[in-house]
């Protein structure tokens, strides 16, 4: 895990350094040809795999689908908390911390979103918003396989958010299939919420 974090940190720093060459507010697309190729690949993955799986997922009874979605949202609260601290938004950080504590203890590890019922609303943030607040430019436009379009800042920030996700530490000794299950569930859950 430490090697993974070191490699990602080096990549992250490389991407951040590359921002200095882009002072305008428009996102640059110097990789248009490869981005188009990856976009076509992602479309095929969506049509032949992700959409059919998401259709099946959406057939689950609503309480099960909601429970899975709630667990995934709950595991994101430590990421929200960390980023709000880095952004200097202490009130939002404490709200995220309280949501996590309440839903993890009284909400059956997040299956039930009790925090929402007592008016502690979810308010997502990520390291991309942190970097934006710190003044980092968006960088280049990238289309990432299996993920989709991102600015290079957003892509680098996704690596940081992944690194601080508590599930990585809870599942570090598990088989690969178990470690990727939350990410796969998140993708399927998000896709089923965006059916066209």
Q: Where does each model-flagged region fall?
A:
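Bacterial N-terminal signal peptides that target proteins for export
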Residues: 1-9
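Bacterial N-terminal signal peptides
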Residues: 8-18
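Immediate N-terminus of the mature polypeptide
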Residues: 20-50, 54
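A structured, mid-to-C-terminal "fold-capping" secondary-structure block
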Residues: 24-26, 32, 129, 135-196
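Residue-level signature of the cytosolic catalytic core of signaling kinases
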Residues: 27-30, 60, 123
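Membrane interface segments of multi-pass transport proteins and intramembrane proteases
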Residues: 48-66, 128
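Beta-rich strand-turn-strand
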Residues: 69-71
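Mid-length scaffold segments of soluble, non-membrane domains
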Residues: 74-77, 81-152
């Amino acid at each position: 895990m430490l090697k993974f974090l070191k490699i990602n940190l080096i990549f992250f720093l490389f991407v951040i350094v590359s921002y200095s060459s882009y002072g305008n507010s428009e996102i640059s697309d110097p990789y248009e040809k490869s981005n188009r190729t990856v976009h076509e690949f992602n479309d095929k993955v969506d049509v032949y795999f992700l959409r059919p799986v998401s259709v099946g997922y959406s057939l689950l009874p609503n309480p099960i689908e909601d429970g899975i979605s709630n667990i995934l949202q709950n595991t994101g609260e430590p990421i929200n908390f960390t980023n709000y601290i880095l952004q200097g938004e202490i009130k939002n950080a404490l709200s995220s911390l309280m949501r996590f504590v309440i839903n993890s203890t009284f909400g059956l590890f997040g299956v039930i979103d009790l925090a929402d019922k007592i008016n502690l609303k979810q308010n997502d943030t990520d390291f991309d918003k942190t970097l934006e607040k710190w003044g980092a430019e968006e960088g280049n436009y990238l289309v990432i396989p299996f993920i989709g379009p991102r600015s290079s800042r957003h892509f680098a920030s996704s690596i940081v958010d992944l690194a601080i996700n508590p599930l990585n530490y809870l599942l570090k000794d598990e088989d690969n299939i178990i470690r990727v299950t939350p990410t796969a569930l998140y993708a399927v859950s998000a896709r089923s919420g965006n059916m066209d």
